[in-house]
Amino acid sequence: MKRNLLYAIVVVLIVIAIGAAVYYYFATVPAPGSEVIKVALVLPGSKSDHGWSQSAFEGLMAAKKKYDIEVDYTEYVLPPEAGDVIRDYCEKGYKLIIVHDFLAKDAVLAAAADYPDIYFCYPTGMDLRTNVASYWSWNHETSYLAGMLAAGLTNSSKVGVYAAVQIPTIVCCLESFKLGVKEMAEELGKTVEIYEAYTGTFEDVAKGYEAVETFASYRADVVYGTGDGINVGGMEAARTYGVYFIGGCGDQHPLDPEKVIASCDWGGEEMICDIIGKFLNGTLQGNVKYEYTLGGGIGPHFAKYYEDIAPEELVQRINETEQAILNGTKTIPKYTEPGSVDP
């Protein structure tokens, strides 16, 4: 009797184990022909610009590897062309389309209205929809550190800063850079003149060259630039005129290891991978701004290559300030109006 009972219990346990294994298999292994998640990225520039476009491309590739999804991308898409590129991805079954260009906003919103079952994301967006979210990389903190560096390194007591257009996430870079220059200069007991400019474009190499050339004519010897093609031109001018250059948008040191002494990296790789992860786990929501900061731990960071040329005291002071930002004991104001800080 006991033997029969034991046998029955063993049989029941085996059946339960087999059932659980079968359930787990079908719950975790995609059925043949099941839908593959497709994510597209539309870039305004080159995937190898060491800036805004490349960092986003690397985020897409990181997400592809991490989540085993199907991805595609298109480079050099100007705003007038963005609508056709976006709609082509919609027709091809892409479920998340990231348009990495604020200036393509109108094309994004128009497509979102016609394809309500597809999610769209674009940077620095305030005009959102139920299927449109935006991501914001705030670099006021890293730009403040760049300002400290410029003030500490300049021998002429003249520095320059330029960017593309006056949108909040870019304006805050210029204003915080100026604040960092002024406060570090005051700490060092000197006065530093600041020259600033907006080029009106992200990609025009000549405009970046002209900005740095103009600053150099005023004897500025350290320049901070934020952009893609405009920074390629800015770095070329920095080489020509012997100016130290602080990159922006991505880590641009590899483009000119001699002249690029630091970069305010906007953290596009981590940011884009995070946005895709949110979409895949069901937490990405329309009508939401996803914001990333140095203190937030995902996205922006300050890439440093100046230890061999900067005074030890300056290096230490910048490191202390960065740590204070990270642990929350120092807050850098987020100025989004041009002229908030006098040059």
Positions of predicted regions on the chain:
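Secretory targeting signatures
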Residues: 1-34
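A residue-level marker of the well-folded mature domains of exported/periplasmic proteins
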Residues: 2-6, 31-343
